[in-house]
UniProtKB/Swiss-Prot annotation:
Residues 269-285 have a biased composition (Acidic residues). This is Zinc finger protein 330. It comes from Homo sapiens. Widely expressed. Higher expression seen in heart and skeletal muscle. The modification Phosphoserine is found at S291. Residues 10-22, 216-225 have a biased composition (Basic and acidic residues). Residues 1-23, 206-320 are annotated as: Disordered. Belongs to the NOA36 family. It is found in: Nucleus; Nucleus, Nucleolus; Chromosome, Centromere. The gene is ZNF330. Its main location: nucleus. A motif (Nuclear localization signal) lies at residues 3-11. Pfam families: NOA36 (PF06524).
């Protein structure tokens, strides 16, 4: 009979199994849930931003830095491979950090494993927004990945890009190489392909996955599973040009919207007529006020004798 497993052996096997699952799921972890892309609130200016070594807005250092690799805020001496040996049971704050990543601009703890592996496996190595072309060092927000083309997006453009990225610009769902119906759609090239034309000599199909796009190599999806419109939408921050100081916002979008809505001359003529009518009404109101003041001046010197309003009427009643 096999030997009975001890408690320490069971714990070691469970730990190895958990580490194996973590290594397998590390490549499929969501970018928004990665420690180097976590949400952080500055202790000084109270502004929310991406996890950073220094605040993007006020350059202050956080009281509890978060490791960009393991996500911990406290280094335990017994259970960690510390490069810098520290006195006491644990260390926090600047005593826990060991480096700053050049790609994600976040602290890395002084653990040997984090220091040696994070720079090579940082998910924000080439993180540049596909819409505004800003990197991690150019804005304070978090970085996201498009669900359709899997390009990097900043926090300002993520919703608008994904809303327009799922739109097919073609008027038909037919294959681009023939007239047959395309069963596979590439969301990066915005094109459909049939079964025969998805086969490519350059990009090989992996086992258990959809065939790659013959143009860009991006994984295709079945057209029947997609709910896409054939209209292309133009809206959001990137529709207008940048301003003089290099900042672009929603001002150009609202200006274009208002100009399209009220651009005809008939609207401006009606608006001028309304302004003239309002001016005439104001002049009439002023004339009425002047006439009221003149009539009140005429009756100021009029004496009606002792009346109830003057307070002397009760004397006349007693005399009678």
């Amino acid at each position: 009979m096999p030997k009975k497993k001890t408690g320490a052996r069971k714990k070691a096997e469970n730990r190895r199994e958990r580490e194996k699952q973590l290594r397998a799921s590390r490549s499929t972890i969501d970018l928004a849930k990665h420690p180097c892309n976590a949400s952080m609130e500055c202790d000084k200016c109270q502004r929310r931003q991406k996890n950073r070594a220094f605040c993007y807005f006020c350059n202050s250092v956080q009281k509890l830095p978060i490791c960009a690799q393991c996500g911990k805020t406290k280094c335990m001496m017994k259970s960690s491979d510390c490069v810098i040996k520290h006195a006491g049971v644990y260390s926090t704050g600047l005593a826990m950090v060991g480096a700053i990543c050049d790609f994600c601009e976040a602290w890395v703890c002084h653990g040997r494993k984090c220091l040696s592996t994070h720079a090579c496996a940082c998910p924000l190595t080439d993180a540049e927004c596909v819409e505004c072309e800003r990197g991690v060092w150019d804005h304070g927000g978090r970085i996201f990945s498009c669900s359709f083309c899997h390009n990097f997006l900043c926090e300002d453009d993520q919703f608008e890009h994904q809303a327009s990225c799922q739109v097919l610009e073609a008027e038909t769902f037919k294959c681009v190489s023939c007239n047959r119906l395309g069963q596979h759609s590439c969301l990066r090239c915005k094109a459909c392909f049939c079964d025969d034309h998805t086969r490519s000599k350059v990009f090989k199909q992996e086992k258990g996955k959809q065939p790659p796009c013959p143009k860009c190599g991006h994984e295709t999806q079945e057209t029947k599973d997609l709910s896409m419109s054939t209209r292309s939408l133009k809206f959001g921050r990137q529709t207008g040009g940048e301003e003089g100081d290099g900042a672009s916002g929603y001002d150009a979008y609202w200006k274009n919207l208002s100009s399209d809505k009220y651009g005809d001359t008939s609207y401006h003529d009606e608006e001028e007529d309304e302004y003239e009518a309002e001016d005439d009404e104001e002049e009439e109101d002023e004339g009425r006020k002047d006439s009221d003041t003149e009539s009140s001046d005429l009756f100021t010197n009029l004496n009606l004798g002792r009346t109830y309003a003057s307070g002397y009427a009760h004397y006349e009643e007693q005399e009678n």
